[in-house]
C-alpha cells in the first residue's frame, strides 16, 4: 500500500468482515514495515513470509541494455532471433486484444497448469483489455511479418517503478521472450528506473528465468494472521525455552508448517507446558 498512515485501527473491522464470510482474517502483501506495524498494534498476530510470492525487482537500465558478461546469454538469444526473423515492435493497444488472446491460448496449450488458474488469468487479461485506458495500462507487441509472436502488459507503481503483469510469447520463435522483455524496457520512459516483474509462484522454471535476469532485489510480501490460543501458547513456550530462536522463525513455523493434529502437547492448569 502507498502512504505512511496507520491502518492498524482498521483490523477489528476487517476481522468482523472476515468472520461474516466464515473466514479467518489474513492480511497479505504487507511490506516489512507494514507487518511490523501490525505486530506492534496487535501482538496476537503472527507474521509469515513466502518466497514463492516475492516480487523480482530489476534496474530498468539492466533490462534495457543487457550489458556485461552476465547478460551474454540474453544477447545471444536476441541475436538468434534477429538473424532468423523479420520483426517489428509496436505499442500495444486494445485493438490487438484478439491476437493477444489467441497467442495466450496457444501458449496455454503447451503448458501444464491448473485449469482454474488459467481461466482466471484469461478473465483477468480480457478485463484488462476491456478497461485498458481506465487502468492506465501500457504494453508492447512483437510481430514477425504480420504475426503477433509476443506481448507484454504492465502499469506504473509510481513515478520510478513500473510493474509487468503479463508477458507471453510463442516459444517456437527462439528469443521472443528475451526480445519483448528488452524492447518494452527500452520503450518505457526513462524516469522509470526500476521494473517489477512480479513473483515466480514457486515454479522452478519461472524462478530460474527470473533469476537469470539478475534482480536488484526481491521484495518481500508478508502475511499477517491472528494466532489461535494454542499457537499463542506454543509461541510463548518456544521463545522461553529457545531464546536464541527469533519470533519471526517461530511464527513462520506456526503459520506455514504447524498442524495441531500432528503436535502432542502436555497441559498444566489448562495451559500448554510441553510440546
Locate the predicted segments by residue:
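Conserved catalytic-core motifs of GNAT/GCN5-like acyltransferases
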Residues: 48-56, 216-227
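Acyl-donor-binding surface of acyltransferase catalytic domains
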Residues: 5-92, 195
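Conserved donor-binding loop and adjoining core beta-sheet/short helix segment
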Residues: 1-34, 143-171, 251-275
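Structured helix-beta-strand junction loops
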Residues: 21, 84-85, 135, 191, ...
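A mid-sequence, solvent-exposed acidic-amphipathic segment
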Residues: 104-163
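Aromatic (often tryptophan-rich) hydrophobic motifs at membrane interfaces
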Residues: 137-224
Amino acid at each position: 500500500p502507498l502512504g505512511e498512515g496507520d491502518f492498524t485501527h482498521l483490523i477489528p473491522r476487517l476481522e468482523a468482515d472476515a468472520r461474516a464470510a466464515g473466514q479467518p482474517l489474513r492480511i497479505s502483501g504487507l511490506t516489512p514495515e507494514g507487518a511490523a506495524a501490525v505486530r506492534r498494534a496487535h501482538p496476537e498476530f503472527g507474521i509469515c513470509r513466502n518466497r514463492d510470492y516475492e516480487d523480482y525487482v530489476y534496474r530498468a537500465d539492466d533490462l534495457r541494455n543487457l550489458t556485461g558478461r552476465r547478460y551474454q546469454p540474453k544477447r545471444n538469444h536476441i541475436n538468434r532471433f534477429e538473424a532468423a526473423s523479420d520483426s517489428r515492435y509496436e505499442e500495444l493497444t486494445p485493438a490487438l486484444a484478439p491476437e493477444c488472446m489467441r497467442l495466450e491460448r496457444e501458449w496455454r496449450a503447451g503448458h501444464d497448469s491448473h485449469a482454474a488458474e488459467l481461466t482466471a488469468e484469461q478473465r483477468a487479461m480480457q478485463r484488462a483489455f476491456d478497461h485498458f485506458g481506465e487502468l492506465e495500462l501500457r504494453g508492447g507487441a512483437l510481430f514477425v511479418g504480420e504475426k503477433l509472436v509476443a506481448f507484454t502488459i504492465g502499469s506504473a507503481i509510481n513515478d520510478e517503478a513500473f510493474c509487468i503483469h503479463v508477458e507471453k510469447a510463442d516459444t517456437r520463435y527462439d528469443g521472443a521472450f528475451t526480445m519483448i522483455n528488452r524492447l518494452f524496457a527500452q520503450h518505457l520512459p526513462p524516469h522509470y528506473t526500476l521494473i517489477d516483474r512480479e513473483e515466480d509462484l514457486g515454479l522452478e522454471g519461472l524462478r530460474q528465468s527470473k533469476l537469470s535476469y539478475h534482480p536488484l532485489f526481491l521484495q518481500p510480501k508478508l502475511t499477517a494472521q491472528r494466532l489461535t490460543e494454542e499457537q499463542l501458547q506454543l509461541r510463548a513456550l518456544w521463545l522461553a525455552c529457545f531464546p536464541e530462536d527469533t519470533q519471526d522463525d517461530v511464527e513462520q513455523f506456526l503459520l506455514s508448517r504447524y498442524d495441531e493434529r500432528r503436535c502432542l502437547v502436555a497441559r498444566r492448569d489448562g495451559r500448554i507446558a510441553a510440546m
